[in-house]
Regions:
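Core dinuclear metal-dependent hydrolase active-site scaffold
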Residues: 1-19, 92-148, 229-235
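Active-site neighborhood of phospho(di)ester-bond hydrolases with catalytic His/Asp-centered motifs
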Residues: 1-4, 23-34, 38, 62-64, ...
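Short, charged/polar "capping" segments at the starts of alpha-helices
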Residues: 9, 67-72, 203-207, 234
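Structured loop/turn residues at beta-strand edges in well-structured enzyme cores
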Residues: 18-21, 57, 89, 105, ...
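P-loop/Walker A phosphate-binding loop and immediately adjacent motor/lid segment at beta-alpha junctions
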Residues: 42-60, 120-127, 168-196
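Acidic/polar short surface loop at catalytic or gating sites that assists cofactor/ion binding
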Residues: 49-92
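Cap/insert and terminal regions of metallo-dependent hydrolase folds
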Residues: 141-230
Length: 235
């Protein structure tokens, strides 16, 4: 789900001992560099494994028409010819539309346009086979098109760029982000069971989890999760 802002994703895979050969599905929400550029490295890595005949099956990247078009354009400009041969053959670009449903990895996904005015961006509802539901809301506050999929879900992955009292410092509103306070109030209104806060500023350091959780619990009665990079937990 998104690719970070660049080659950091390679280090993350290495640090967490993740196997590229087992990665077959990815989703890219939008074109902004902190989400987009790492996906180019993902595609390059998969293409090199394919060239070496060390990757079984195909790789599928899901996204809206705008972001997929730009990924494909960049890949055609900068990847070597041997890698480009796998684009749209073994490396597949799967277009999804607003409210479209797809069955992926034994899960049911419903994709939706988050209504961003900065760049076309999609989120999704993921329904587990045990009935649980997860919503990835994109990196802006939930609007009505996303809220209707988020009522009573088990997990809401919501951006919150900073604490409410530090908005003037980090300018969350200027960039169409929200604070922990707003994210928590929305989650409470939607009766979400678990709120996972991501896409945060990175200056708070080791106290971020504690401080963000403390603010969230003032407005939200469910479980609050503020993961650190590389943290793994059971959803």
């Amino acid at each position: 789900m998104d690719g970070t802002g660049g080659s950091d994703i390679l280090r993350a895979f290495d640090t967490m001992d993740l196997n590229w050969k087992k990665l077959h599905y990815a989703f890219l929400s939008h074109e902004h560099t902190d989400h987009f550029l790492g996906m180019i490295w993902v595609i390059r890595t998969i293409a090199e494994l394919l060239e070496l005949e060390e990757y079984e099956g195909d790789f599928y990247l899901y996204g809206n028409d705008v972001v997929l078009g730009k990924v494909l354009h960049v890949c055609r400009m900068i990847l070597k010819k041997q890698s480009q041969a796998f684009l749209e053959t073994r490396i597949k670009f799967v277009l999804v539309k607003d409210h479209e449903r797809k069955h992926i990895l034994n899960y049911d996904f419903t994709f939706f346009d988050i209504g961003s005015t900065k760049a076309k961006q999609y989120g999704f509802l993921m329904e587990y086979d045990n009935g649980k539901k997860l919503v990835f809301a994109g990196d802006e506050p939930l609007k009505e098109n996303g809220k209707k999929y988020s009522k009573n879900v088990d997990w809401l992955l919501s951006e919150a760029f900073c604490l409410f009292d530090e908005e003037l410092k980090f300018h969350a509103y200027q960039y169409q982000h929200q604070t922990v306070k707003e994210a928590s109030m929305i989650a409470q209104d939607l009766k979400v069971k678990n709120l996972l806060i991501w896409h945060t500023e990175d200056q708070t350091g080791k106290k971020r989890k504690e401080r963000y959780t403390e603010e969230a619990k003032q407005f939200y009665k469910g479980n609050v999760w503020v993961p650190e990079d590389g943290e793994v937990f059971n959803m």
